[in-house]
């Protein structure tokens, strides 16, 4: 790829693509090839100021636009996304690395979020009680809150932005998006299509960059709320700094999801689900299976099945239809993953499938093959830390109660899954596990646009989760009106 093939990205402010107030840029790589595909500006707080000002000006008219009219724009946007499904999926694969099959699934999730947001006339409805007392009635009305800031991660460049700005905008707010500097290309395409659907200028703005943009949004007085998805340390920082400046904040953070396999489980089905959950998207998702707690009686059988299935996975450039496991996002993330693998060995875990030996790991791109450890304990870093890579740790347990207790010792509590044929075990799991997203005989309890999504403990900072009715509550404020008619 020559320099002329590299896309030079701009910011999207007030309906215009404009240069940032800086000459500093960062390279965007195709992680499957290691080649530079774009340069993204490292924008400044001046760029944030311009975007917020544009959003504030647009809010004056957009917030007064009738809700059904806003919904019609969302419906047009949804159809454009459907029409561009394959194109969007290819962009996801190019800048993120996940397989084209998974990318198409991510596009579907994003479209579902827009579909949900298009139901704004219903979502924005208030409530009324006509007879709170003699001659008195009371009602609740919803209103937008103003300019919203969104900070999104690299691992879902389509789905996460689409669960933020379409719903916020449908509720009458305006939006400033800071996409991950590692995957900014898809965000630009989303903005182009929204404009094509008829979105007025300034309602959606994009400011590319890193720390300065994040801090600019967190500190700006006219930004009323921040939605964030990313790592635990940054989520905590965003929450504390945002609330310090008087903002609503929802910050979805890291994870270390446990899958529990009981002796009565269908091991073949469990194996298939765990493989997909652990190694799909190269393990770079907050719902990835990171730890398997398996009852001792079936541990050897399950482990052999996991290794056999892992050996059959096709590793490579995700644009090829037959590929299951693509690269991790960057060279430094690959090196970090290799350090965790070495740490597991040094701390005494049994490395039973070494992804470092897959030939793709030693070629072009940022590949790490499926890696499986046995005899892991909760004292090891590979059990404690979010690795965010195709590394699976197996712990042998004697009972469901022990497995639940083990999972609950993690500081993370995003998700957990149980494989069993027992209704009583399912109930025990549901009532005692400390996590926000639970799966029963499935590997990934994925977020749905119409239900709230997030975790517990250090996996979430805030009060209102993403998606569903929580999302509507987050992006709106309420008025209570009590009236006596004379």
Swiss-Prot record:
Physiological role: Catalyzes the oxidation of malonate semialdehyde (MSA) and methylmalonate semialdehyde (MMSA) into acetyl-CoA and propanoyl-CoA, respectively. Is involved in a myo-inositol catabolic pathway. Bicarbonate, and not CO2, is the end-product of the enzymatic reaction.
Swiss-Prot/TrEMBL GO biological process terms: inositol catabolic process; thymine catabolic process; valine catabolic process
PANTHER family per the UniProt record, alphabetical: MALONATE-SEMIALDEHYDE DEHYDROGENASE
Binding of NAD(+), residues: 154, 178, 181-182, 231, 386
GO function terms (MF aspect): malonate-semialdehyde dehydrogenase (acetylating) activity; methylmalonate-semialdehyde dehydrogenase (acylating, NAD) activity
Domain of life, per lineage: Bacteria
Record note on quaternary structure: Homotetramer.
Catalytic activity: 3-oxopropanoate + NAD(+) + CoA + H2O = hydrogencarbonate + acetyl-CoA + NADH + H(+); 2-methyl-3-oxopropanoate + NAD(+) + CoA + H2O = propanoyl-CoA + hydrogencarbonate + NADH + H(+)
Species annotation: Bacillus pumilus (strain SAFR-032)
SUPFAM superfamilies linked to this entry: ALDH-like
Family membership: Belongs to the aldehyde dehydrogenase family. IolA subfamily.
Active site: 286 (nucleophile)
Keyword Oxidoreductase tagged: yes
Pathway participation: Polyol metabolism; myo-inositol degradation into acetyl-CoA; acetyl-CoA from myo-inositol: step 7/7
The name this protein goes by in its record: Malonate-semialdehyde dehydrogenase
Name of the gene: iolA
EC number, as in UniProt: 1.2.1.27
Enzyme class (EC, first level): oxidoreductase
PROSITE patterns in the record: ALDEHYDE_DEHYDR_CYS (PS00070)
């Amino acid at each position: 790829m020559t320099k002329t093939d590299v896309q030079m990205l701009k910011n999207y402010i007030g309906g215009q693509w404009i240069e940032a107030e800086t000459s500093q840029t960062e390279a965007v790589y195709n992680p499957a090839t290691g080649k530079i595909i774009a340069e993204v500006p490292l924008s400044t707080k001046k760029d944030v100021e311009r975007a917020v000002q544009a959003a504030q000006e647009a809010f004056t008219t957009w917030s007064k636009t009738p809700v059904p009219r806003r919904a019609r724009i969302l419906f047009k946007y949804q159809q454009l996304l459907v029409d561009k499904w394959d194109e969007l999926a290819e962009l996801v694969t190019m800048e993120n690395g996940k397989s084209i099959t998974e990318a198409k699934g991510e596009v579907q999730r994003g479209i579902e979020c827009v579909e949900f947001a298009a139901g704004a006339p219903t979502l924005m409805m208030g409530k009324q009680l006509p007879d709170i007392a003699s001659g008195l009635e009371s009602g609740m009305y919803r209103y937008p809150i103003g300019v919203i800031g969104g900070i999104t991660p690299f691992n879902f460049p389509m789905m996460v932005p689409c669960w933020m700005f379409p719903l916020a905008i449908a509720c009458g707010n305006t939006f400033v998006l800071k996409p991950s500097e590692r995957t900014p290309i898809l965000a630009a395409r989303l903005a182009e299509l929204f404009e094509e659907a008829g979105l007025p200028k300034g309602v959606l703005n994009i400011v590319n960059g890193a720390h300065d943009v994040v801090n600019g949004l967190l500190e700006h007085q006219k930004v009323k709320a921040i939605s964030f998805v990313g790592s635990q340390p940054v989520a905590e920082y965003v929450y504390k700094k945002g609330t310090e400046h008087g903002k609503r904040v929802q910050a979805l953070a890291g994870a270390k999801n446990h899958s529990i396999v009981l002796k009565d489980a269908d091991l073949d089905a469990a194996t298939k689900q765990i493989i997909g959950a652990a190694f799909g998207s190269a393990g770079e998702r907050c719902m990835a299976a990171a730890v398997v707690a398996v009852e001792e009686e079936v541990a050897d059988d399950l482990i052999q099945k996991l290794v056999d299935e892992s050996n059959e996975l096709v590793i490579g450039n995700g644009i090829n239809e037959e590929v299951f496991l693509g690269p991790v996002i960057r060279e430094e993330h690959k090196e970090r993953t290799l350090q965790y693998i070495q740490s597991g060995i040094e701390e005494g875990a049994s490395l039973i499938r070494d992804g470092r030996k897959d030939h793709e790991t030693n070629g072009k791109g940022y590949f790490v093959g499926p890696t499986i450890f046995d005899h892991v304990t909760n004292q090891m870093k590979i059990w404690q830390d979010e690795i965010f890579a195709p590394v699976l740790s197996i712990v042998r347990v004697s009972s469901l109660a022990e497995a639940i207790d083990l999972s609950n010792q993690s500081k993370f509590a995003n998700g957990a899954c149980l494989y069993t044929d027992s209704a009583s075990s399912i109930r025990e799991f549901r009532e005692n596990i400390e996590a926000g997203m639970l799966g029963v005989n499935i590997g990934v309890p994925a977020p749905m646009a119409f239900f709230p999504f997030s975790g517990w403990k250090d996996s979430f900072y805030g009060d209102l989760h993403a998606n569903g009715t929580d999302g509507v509550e987050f992006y709106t404020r309420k008025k209570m009106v009590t009236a006596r008619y004379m």
